[in-house]
């Protein structure tokens, strides 16, 4: 790959919304095809491999409930709606904590229950505290226990291989802190060449991680894989490379007897001496040649035994034919 001067990676825009971050980056110039390679690789890793904490286990202590198809006295939403809202709570961990992390909710009505009402241990922060969970009236008195676990991507509740205790409701693990990634390729000009490319990368993330942090993490994951391959190359045992000799098999189509008889004697590829002897005796085609016996050919001037053997061999190899013997 040719070294390209003037290549730049730039942050073109960054916006902070109430519940997410947005950033747009550009990288150019790139050799043709590299923008697709880089953009697609980063997108896949960003969406699938950035880990985080997510609420995955819920238990309604007060009032005591045992499944998601129930209702809660004093709450506008039923348990299913509250669980769906809990899955959208965004958590940031500022210090190392063991997974799972226990969280709690204690809330009396009337009022609105939000993510900010979740009580977290030291080092764990709810980064979207205004996120709506439920509306409570004056009869509501809620106590909920939650567990947040560490993971990546999306893990269905059925795949977590855990048997919850009675009263615990297991949720799907929506771990990925990256909401969406787009990439776009544009053509750019470098000197007289117009086939270079510019990669535009757009990243949307939850408030638990900034796009720049997610991008750095994804790059580290990719580099770790390539470094492993590079370091492993020296340990890979070289296998002997077999030399395969390809033999070309040429099959000539003989054709019908009429076609063969009309072919020129030049197609036998005889030596000049033998060919000239035949031509001087008016032998122009294969048919003319086969009309003569071996004794008749031997009477041709300068046509000796060596020439006869050559004609025999060529007729046999090329057309599967043979000369007639003389009459005894």
UniProtKB/Swiss-Prot annotation:
It holds the Pfam family RNA_pol_A_CTD. Keywords: DNA-directed RNA polymerase, Nucleotidyltransferase, Transcription, Transferase. One of its GO terms (biological process) is DNA-templated transcription. Its EC number is 2.7.7.6. GO terms for molecular function: DNA binding; DNA-directed RNA polymerase activity; protein dimerization activity. InterPro entries: DNA-dir_RNA_pol_insert (IPR011262), DNA-dir_RNA_pol_RpoA/D/Rpb3 (IPR011263), DNA-dir_RpoA (IPR011773), RBP11-like (IPR036603), RNAP_asu_C (IPR011260), RNApol_insert_sf (IPR036643). The N-terminal domain is essential for RNAP assembly and basal transcription, whereas the C-terminal domain is involved in interaction with transcriptional regulators and with upstream promoter elements. Residues 1-230 are annotated as: Alpha N-terminal domain (alpha-NTD). One of its GO terms (cellular component) is DNA-directed RNA polymerase complex. The gene is rpoA. This is DNA-directed RNA polymerase subunit alpha. Residues 257-328 are annotated as: Alpha C-terminal domain (alpha-CTD). DNA-dependent RNA polymerase catalyzes the transcription of DNA into RNA using the four ribonucleoside triphosphates as substrates. Homodimer. The RNAP catalytic core consists of 2 alpha, 1 beta, 1 beta' and 1 omega subunit. When a sigma factor is associated with the core the holoenzyme is formed, which can initiate transcription. It comes from Fervidobacterium nodosum (strain ATCC 35602 / DSM 5306 / Rt17-B1). It is an enzyme of class 2 (transferase). Belongs to the RNA polymerase alpha chain family. It catalyses: RNA(n) + a ribonucleoside 5'-triphosphate = RNA(n+1) + diphosphate.
């Amino acid at each position: 790959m040719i070294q390209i001067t003037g290549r730049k990676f730039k942050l073109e825009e960054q916006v902070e919304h109430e519940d997410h971050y947005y950033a747009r980056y550009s990288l150019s110039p790139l050799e043709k095809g590299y923008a697709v390679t880089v953009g697609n690789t980063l997108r896949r890793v960003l969406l699938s491999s950035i880990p985080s904490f997510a609420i995955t286990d819920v238990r309604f202590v007060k009032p005591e409930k045992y499944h998601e198809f129930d209702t809660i006295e004093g709450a506008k939403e039923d348990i299913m709606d509250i669980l769906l809202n809990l899955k959208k709570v965004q958590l940031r961990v500022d210090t190392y904590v063991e997974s799972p992390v226990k969280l709690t909710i204690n809330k009396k009505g009337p009022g609105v229950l939000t993510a900010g009402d979740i009580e977290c241990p030291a080092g764990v922060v709810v980064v979207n505290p205004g996120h709506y969970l439920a509306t409570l009236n004056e009869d509501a008195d809620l106590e909920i226990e939650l567990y947040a676990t560490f993971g990546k991507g999306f893990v269905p509740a059925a795949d977590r291989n855990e048997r919850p205790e009675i009263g615990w409701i297991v949720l799907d693990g929506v771990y990925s802190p990256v909401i969406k990634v787009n990439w776009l390729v544009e053509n750019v000009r470098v000197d007289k060449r117009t086939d270079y490319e510019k990669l535009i990368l757009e990243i949307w993330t939850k408030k638990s991680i900034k796009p720049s942090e997610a991008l750095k993490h994804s790059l580290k994951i990719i580099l770790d894989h390539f470094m492993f391959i590079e370091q492993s190359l020296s340990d890979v045992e070289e296998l002997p490379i077999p030399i395969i000799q390809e033999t070309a098999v040429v099959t000539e189509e003989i054709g019908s007897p009429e076609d063969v008889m009309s072919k020129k004697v030049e197609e036998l590829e005889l030596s000049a001496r033998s060919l000239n002897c035949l031509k001087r005796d008016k032998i122009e085609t294969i048919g003319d040649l086969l009309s003569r016996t071996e004794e008749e050919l031997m009477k041709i001037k300068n046509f000796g035994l060596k020439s006869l053997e050559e004609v025999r061999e060529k007729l046999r190899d090329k057309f599967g034919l043979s000369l007639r013997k003389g009459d005894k």
